[in-house]
Amino acid sequence: MSWRRFFSRAARARERDDEMRAHLALYTEELIARGRTPEQAAREARLAFGNPRAKLEEVDRMNALPVFDVLGRDVRYAFRVMRRTPAFTATAIVTLALVIGACTAVFTLADAILLRPLPYPQPERLAYVERWIASYGRDAAALSHDGLTWEMIRDRVPSLHSAAYGSSFGSGVNLVVGEATAIVRQQRVSADYFSVLGVPPRVGRSFTADEDRPGGPPAVVLSDRLWRTTFGGDGNIVGKGVLLRGEPYTVVGIMPSDFINIDEVDVWTPLQASQRGEGGGTNFGVIARPKPGVTIDQAEMELLALGQEPFRNLQFRSDLTALLGLRPMQDALVEGVREPIVMLGAAVGVVLLIACVNLAALLLARGGSRAKEIATRMALGSGRRAVVRQLMIEALVLALAGGALGILAGQLILQGLQAIGGQTFAEWERVALDWRALLVTIGLAGSTSLVFGLVPAVQASRLNVNAALGESGSRSIAGAARHWPRRLLVVTEVALGVVLLVTAGLLVRTFVELQRLDPGFNPRGLTTASVSLLDARYTTGEQMHLLFERSLDRLSRAPGVQSAAVSLGLPYERLLNLGFRFVDAADDQGRTTNATYVAGDLFGTMEIPLRRGRLLTAADRETTAPVAVVNESFARFYSKERDVIGRRIRMSGGEREIVGVVGNVQQRGSGFYLEGMSDGPLTSPPLVYVPASQAIDAMRGVHVWFSPVWVVRARSTGEAATAVRDAISSVDPLLPVGQARAMTDVMARATAEQRLLMTLVGVLAAAALLLAAIGIHGLIAHSVAERRRELGIRLALGATVGRTIRGIALGGVALAAIGAVAGGLLSLAAVRLVQSFLWNVGERDPLTFTLVVLFVLVVSAVASVIPALRILKLDPAQTLRA
């Protein structure tokens, strides 16, 4: 017997027909052989076999699998129901596709970034070495170490296979290949770095111990991306030379294309660590992998056994005890993105739940209109279980259809998330849908069908059959029992929507507060472009000063340029931290400030106001008395008791006199904390401006972390960008210029995370409110249709249309009010998820809660009034005759 009969009803029918005809033919031939005429034989054979259809059905019942047959019949009926109600079907499928797609996209992000193991061999054994102060707790641990600590870990912890790395040059370094120039990201790593990760170069080799010693041969390993884009995928590049930071390096290796480049590094060079220079501060990170047979706990015990000796050069207070331990690499890498993804996942989950509740309410309404159909099925012998099974299969078919479209929607939503969030969270750009996301989509489809299908199915199975067959439509479930499930679902929708609206409202309030901050300068018309001076051709202050002076002179004569200047860093970004002390304060133990050098008229170009004293001018040169200008925060925090002008400070480069005070500008963090200073995403910490001509020799070492930025005020960004490139190229043709950015873009980037989360949660909150409004609208519309005769009688007896509409609409508003109160209470707990993203706004901000409740009530009133207006079409006389 063919296996097709288990899967195809038509195939089974054809098989049974053929078999029946064969038996009839054989019996007919037998009767003819006994002497019957062909007509007599055919008639007797048919009489002997009986009704062919009944026989076929009997054979089907004997041979078919009952479960498959029943399920197949229910599925086919579900498709017929879907075809009869195209509007409902389309609404349900599209709603499910969007919310399942959103859940799939967010799961894909969470899976790829938070859940999936790192793409290295035995990733669970990879860790960072961290350092913390015992009395401060491990939550305040740092991942940075000095040269002595690294050497002791390397030489005196035999259970660890470890490697060190220096901070990647965030501002980039100069790469010259032939006549082409580019700014690339460089990271210095110790010789064992790639072997600790377990990923060797695809071509060539990693660094040798000789290359990693101070003064060793200069070697470089290229990323696959740089090798393809800059070197054209030349397989013979290994062994050849390039100019990096103005110095010759030999290419020794190329990393694989699937190597996960955590810091988006383009080139790696030997660390060549020591206890001097950079190694004198906590500028190294250490990764480690316990050797075979050694557990993480055993390795940590060896680190602790080092005692306080690794911290000898850090000069901690005698009452502080420093400790070393291991932090799993996976945990450390996702620390900065875990909260946004968790929050986004929670928001999407709430929207999914609201969608399920909404669909359950719609199915309840449709169940009322199908009361006579369901009652007929039950009267003909279908039990409650059969009715529940049929309705659950209808819900499952809807959910699977929505899930199928949800895969496409998930891909589109993921691409949208990457487009708007990739600049803020670089990890998002490496994410793609895969089979795990497909399984999640299928699981979501199945679970959502259970959530939104069960209540309507159970409710429909409780139908009063006699009442349903004797009355019209949906009045077969008597009393309030037919209304409370839908009302409860609407209240639930509104409550969950309020939670999202409050969350979005708090994020909006935070963003508005950030936007209301006075930047301290005029950003309109400003364009910026940076240049890396971490280059062998710029090792003296004189070389840098000539670059600044000549390029600014060229810019001053460029068409469309109004003014230009150079600064070490920009507002709305991080600036350099420097220690200083007042010369006239004998007991001054030292303080910390942000600092920057200035060439040209920075204050005039950016329109930073002078508060008192004077500005830095071209007359402040290396041959004149060293001076400085400070901002208002410096004067307020550090010289509150006396006028700061005229005071002398000692900082990098010697003593200098403060000659002026300018207004504050906003920065993205400060790197230190002072009581009374804002700790939000934007702040105005103390800041010292010094003339570049008087400070470059002392501050040129900071070009490892910071690059000088040309700031130009011009008619357009395009004109300014061209002018900067031409001006710098006229001085040094081999010096690449970074991408030109409008100052407004720099400002937007500083609050990009807040803007992104506000936008995403806001969109989800709007979707939740729309679904809740649809639920209220559907409930009121169904109520009006159900009460059509009652309302007609009321109008015939003299009730006014306005009062009737108001009474109907108030029912929806009352449900929304109950939901708003419940949602407000839930929000008090839910907003803790976003507490770390709020600034200058309390998590129980009364304005936000009040506005959300009022907005929900207004929307619910509109959603209730629209269907209530249908009574305007009622003709009382016609209604009474009906």
Features from the language model and the residues they span:
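Short, strongly hydrophobic transmembrane alpha-helices
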Residues: 87-113, 117, 354-357, 403, ...
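Membrane-proximal extracellular/periplasmic loop immediately following the first transmembrane helix
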Residues: 118-170, 282-287, 302, 327, ...
